């Protein structure tokens, strides 16, 4: 039975873990880091760079390096979030044929699930390198406040990456699972608040832990609030300060300068979590008619905190709503877990302490705990982890549009999932052949203000006076938080044909095309890696052979010397070829002839 990996697919960084010997293990990537930047760089040669290597080349290739794709996943191009991304991204954000927000690289459109799949493939490869076996199953985490479209898009990303996604699990729930695994046998009930402020999203979940049962009581959040926004405030501040001393020159209009600013802002933000001030020093950041320009600015913690006060304050209202929905006052919370890199900021920790009236728990790694929880859930699903039951909730209400454009809720938010509820529909006019159902998700009173999931037409209704046909529509939310709808004619007992016209997301044909594309790129990447390794080995062989030939030429016959030199020159000629077979053949020839040097040395020593 193959291993199930747990993946935290983050906005800024991703992490992968696996259960080994009953314990979760975070897997370091090929660079030795336990987290991987969620960045993808597209090079001129068509190569796709992922993680740290993509981040390193972003400054010189900003318009072809995609970051924070998770913020676009499941979103419309003309949504407020889509428009905001356009304003701050050095890469191009474009509209797909169905209006979704995609990124455009060198004239080709890539869906956010497709970009996320490239990151997931890197995490899959990281796990396979560590385990020494193929991995095909995963548990992937999402922000608790993700809607159906965003969850489905994340599942699609997993499929494109060649993974069977066994479960989509909420990030705060995963963190609670990681925190509470060693407390499964303890008696009593523990109430936990998970405050999760990551790179792109904010979640708050209230849970109760009791004898291995992890029950989510409520969840709330903001899917467009996170470290990226904190970075942006610092970018804007530095750009403004630079403009003030350089005749209004706006660095944000220069894509390369913007990327350097972004990296500097991120670094300064990290440093200000442990130091009272930091210096941002960017020489030759741009130039004008008067010559090159340099940016040097000292930023102290108080200045940074003032820039982001409103962002931190925005996290408090969801906390208040979550406690109210759970029916638990703040003083009854036993533990507050801090999750996500932004919770390292002292002002964030102080705000959490002020609101909950207690010191938050800092005994977990905020960057790794979510992946650890996902791995544990994988262990639960495979039967490796016993005596653990996870009861999560749907973050948003599910309902339909009724007369007058009103949103009628059928499944309320914070209902434990999986769950199923039904509603009976009928016809409004005589002999009506179909009933249209508009399914939505959200909390607003009017249908137009909520998120459309799909429109269903229940067709083939037998002719009858209005109000007579009884069509039962069942709404089913699975354990992944993904919505399924079925319909049944109560009069005939027949299941009605349901035509689903989803207004967003990828079609099955698009997903299959992306799977093929990903597989082809994976094959290309493997060939490139093998060629690079072969080239490195050949380069090493050339060096050692030349050195040995120079040192031990006198031990060789003239014929052997000439043959080795000929093979050496041949390998040098083909060293930069892209034909692996030609390079391998020349490598093996020189390897064989160079063996004569070792043979001659051995014979010489023996005599």
UniProtKB/Swiss-Prot annotation:
GO MF: ATP binding; ATP-dependent protein folding chaperone; unfolded protein binding
UniProt organism field: Myxococcus xanthus (strain DK1622)
Inducers of expression: By stress conditions e.g. heat shock.
Function: Potential chaperone for other proteins involved in social motility.
Record-given protein name: Chaperone protein DnaK
Gene: dnaK
Zinc among keywords: no
Annotated positions of the Phosphothreonine modification: 201
Keywords: ATP-binding, Chaperone, Nucleotide-binding, Phosphoprotein, Stress response
Upper classification of the organism: Bacteria, Pseudomonadati, Myxococcota, Myxococcia, Myxococcales
InterPro entries: ATPase_NBD, Chaperone_DnaK, Heat_shock_70_CS, HSP70_C_sf, HSP70_peptide-bd_sf, Hsp_70_fam
Similarity comment: Belongs to the heat shock protein 70 family.
